[in-house]
Amino acid sequence: MSLRLTNTLTRRTEPFTPLKDGHVSIYCCGVTVYDLCHLGHARSYIAWDVLRRYLLWRGYSVTFVQNFTDIDDKILKRAAEKKCSMEHISEQNIEAFHQDMDALGILRPDRMPRATQCLDGIRALIGELETSGAAYSVDGDVYFAVMKHHGYGKLSGRDLNEQQQNADGRVADAEEARKQHSFDFALWKGAKTGEPSFPSPWGAGRPGWHIECSAMVREELGETIDIHLGGADLIFPHHENEIAQSEAATGKQLARYWLHNGMVNVGGQKMSKSLGNFTTIRALLESGVSPMTLRLFILQAHYRKPLDFTADAINAAATGWKGLNAALGLGNIYAEALNWPECKPLPQEVMQPAHSSTLEQCSEIRQHFIDALDDDLNSSGAIAVLFDLARPLRALANRLERGDTKAIQETAQLNLLPRWQLLVELANVLGLEAEKAAKLAPEGNNRVDENHIQLAIAARKEAKAARDFAKADRIRDELRAQGIELIDKPGGLTDWISS
């Protein structure tokens, strides 16, 4: 079986065939850099990191492009709040983004264009759309004429007649009268007093949100790409509008495969900054959740399905990772005692013509792993393979950690080295790597005073009820400094996790 992916555009799971044999072009919608990334971002970028790693492991060359939106209403609002420049907010959060992604072991994209660095391409694309009649200008603003694009709605499945006005939430009510149709969206926004602006044939202004990605895809990867990635919340309007703009300009298909990840939910609601129910990646890691625990938590659910963020789920992932980490670290820690001279991943070609029962088993295990990821990136199935592979390794590691030297002789006949090498190799495809053994904390230092936490949660709830949000934030920060991360849920309930 070859790799099969669920294509949002066709609503089918299809065999993946790249445009160019052996090479895959991928564009992933990046973040708007006005704040720190939350767990929803981690879910998206870990999922696509696994896609990229898997393609590379299977022998493809991959060009992976991911953008930064560094000019947007949210950035301008944050800059005004902080009394600093838009550039300062963008640079600060781009650096934070890199730090968070690096901490999670996410491979950096090959190229990361910024909207403000692609203005020539953006202006050129808007000009082409206006010349063809697909766009029109009104007093310094330029809009895309949705009704003139007959394929509009093919990605989201929406009918224009059923859509609400201002579906993208980015056009103010006062501007409605300027547009030919309420569904038309801005390609270029005329300059406003006090806001940064850039020159254009239509006057000073700045690009709309959707046109940025269309221009960057064309500039970095060409008119048609293999795979376009993003969260399910981007299907409409962002990706629908991308398709409309790009295909109206080029007459060619923008992307052959559209993949979308499901949302992270807290108490049945999507995690988002607008709802205030989000947890940043940084806060979660600072609370003591390890990067690999977070990866495992995210990958235990299929990328297209909703993912419920709960303390129990994080703690279960931490327990699972503890065992997997012990197995992965076996060859690093006990190589000399086990007389394993070559502690490197087993070459794939060795696995094919198996000459022993161990290698035959490894070959079968490898194929089970491939079958799982070929099935629309079934990461939970791939992780199940890792746990089965790790079981005897974890048992040996536990015995050695207890000082049981008999374990070496008793397991010698099992020939576990190829099994460990395969585990390291396959885990790396999922971005899971052994962590260094943590130093033991002094007696009593790692105990959690649950009564103290509950009292603090109650005090914070009272502060919020009294609208003393500064005090509520201070209590949260104090608990965070103690390694406790709070998780607010609907109905005024608060859960917590600890390191």
Swiss-Prot record:
A motif ('KMSKS' region) lies at residues 270-274. It catalyses: tRNA(Cys) + L-cysteine + ATP = L-cysteinyl-tRNA(Cys) + AMP + diphosphate. It comes from the Bacteria. Its cofactor is Zn(2+). Zn(2+) binds at C29, C213, H238, E242. GO terms for biological process: cysteinyl-tRNA aminoacylation. InterPro entries: Cys-tRNA-ligase, Cys-tRNA-synt_Ia_DALR, Cys-tRNA/MSH_ligase, Rossmann-like_a/b/a_fold, tRNA-synt_1_cat_dom, tRNAsynth_Ia_anticodon-bd. A motif ('HIGH' region) lies at residues 31-41. Keywords: Aminoacyl-tRNA synthetase, ATP-binding, Cytoplasm, Ligase, Metal-binding, Nucleotide-binding, Protein biosynthesis, Zinc. Its EC number is 6.1.1.16. ATP binds at K273. Binds 1 zinc ion per subunit. GO terms for molecular function: ATP binding; cysteine-tRNA ligase activity; zinc ion binding. Its main location: cytoplasm. It is found in: Cytoplasm. Pfam families: DALR_2, tRNA-synt_1e. PANTHER family: CYSTEINE--TRNA LIGASE, CYTOPLASMIC, CYSTEINYL-TRNA SYNTHETASE. HAMAP family: Cys_tRNA_synth. NCBIfam families: cysS (TIGR00435). Monomer. Belongs to the class-I aminoacyl-tRNA synthetase family. This is Cysteine--tRNA ligase. It comes from Prochlorococcus marinus (strain MIT 9303). The gene is cysS.
